[in-house]
Amino acid sequence: MSSSLSDRSALVLDLGARYVRCGISGERAPRCVERWQVGDMLQKPLSAAEWRQYLYPKLHALCFDLLLVNPTRRRFVVCEDLLLPRVFRETLLNILFDVLKASAVTVVPSMMAVLYATTNHTALVVDCGWAETRLLPVFKGIPLPYLYETVSVGSRNCCEVIKRELNVYRDQPMDGSKLVTPITETMAEDILERACFAQQKDPLPNVVDAEFQTQDMQVSGNLRTAAVEQLLSGDDGTDGTSIVDGIIHVLKKAPLDIRAAMLENLLLVGGTAMIPGLAQRVVAEVREALRHDNEFASASDAVGRAQLVQTYFPRNMLAWVGGSIYAATDSARVSAISSQEYSSSKGTSIPDWLTVAEEEF
C-alpha cells in the first residue's frame, strides 16, 4: 500500500526568484515555503559548479529537513520559468537524478501550471515576481511563446523606495543619543507585505500611518501607497515601463482574433500580485489606457469587458497548486523524464522551452 501511495504522489517544486515552494502532489497548499537567492544570483552568469554548490544544500534540506520524506525513487514535478539559464536547469536535473535518486522528473512552465488551478484554458498570464514581471498569452490551452514578454519591475522596486524614504528619516533621529538601525531589504519587504496597498482610481482621501512596534518605526500613509505606484508608473529604475505597459504591448502584438479573449481573462499571479488592490488597479489602468488608444477604438466593447480571472487560491500559490494538480494527471507521467532516459542521454534530454515550442508548433 505504501509503495502504491509513493508511486502516486510526487514532490512538487515551484521555483521562484525569491522563494521556493515544496509539497506533495494532490494537496491544496505547499508544506513549506523557503526563501532563496536564485533571483539575485541570476543577475550574473554562474558555472554549473557554482549552481551545484548553492542548489544541493537547499534541495537536500527541503526533502529531508522540511518535508521529512526520502526523495529516492520518487517523482518530481518542477514548475519553472520559461527562460531560466540552461546551466541552471541541467544542474538541477543532475542533483535530482544523480544525488537525490529521483525516479522521474516532469518539468512544466509555471505560467502554464497556474491554469490548472483555475477553470480557464485561456488567459493572459501576468506573473508579478520579485525582480521582474513576465507575461505569456495562453489560448485554449496552447501557449504563445512568441508573445512572451518581460518587464523589469517587481517587488524589489517597491522595497527600494521604502528603504530610501525611511532611511532618510532614520538617519536624522530625534534623539541624537539613540542608535537607529537602517532599514534593510528584508525589513522593507516585510513593510511592503504588511502595510502597503494599491490605491484605486478613486483614491482614499486619508490613509493612516502604520506603526511597527518591533522595529520602533512608523510608515507614513503616503509611503504605504506611493511604494506600490512603482509597479504602475514605471519610475525608479524600471526603464519607464510598468506592468500596464507590458500588458498593452502584448495585446498589440497579439493576433486580432484573440485580443478580446486575452482582455476578458487577465490572470495576475505571483507574490507581488498579493499586494492588496494591485490586481484590480491594473485592470482599471488597462481599461483607461486602451480607451484612449486609437488601435483599440474599434474594440471598445472588448475593452469594457476587461476583467480578472477568478482565482480560488492565493495568487502567490497558484503555480504550486497547479503543479500539484498536474502531477496527478496522466499527462505528467507521459511527459516525465525517467532516470533511465536521463542516464542514457547523459543529461541532454531537457531541451529549452522555446526549442520545444518551435518543434511542436
Language model features with spans:
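Conserved phosphate-binding catalytic cores of ATP/NTP-utilizing and phosphoryl-transfer enzymes
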Residues: 1-5, 102-126
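Phosphate/ATP-binding catalytic cores across multiple sugar-kinase/actin-like superfamilies
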Residues: 58-66, 224-261, 281
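Glycine-rich phosphate-binding loops at beta-strand->alpha-helix junctions
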Residues: 80-89, 196, 200, 264-285, ...
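Structured C-terminal portions of repeat-based eukaryotic scaffold domains
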Residues: 251-268, 272-307
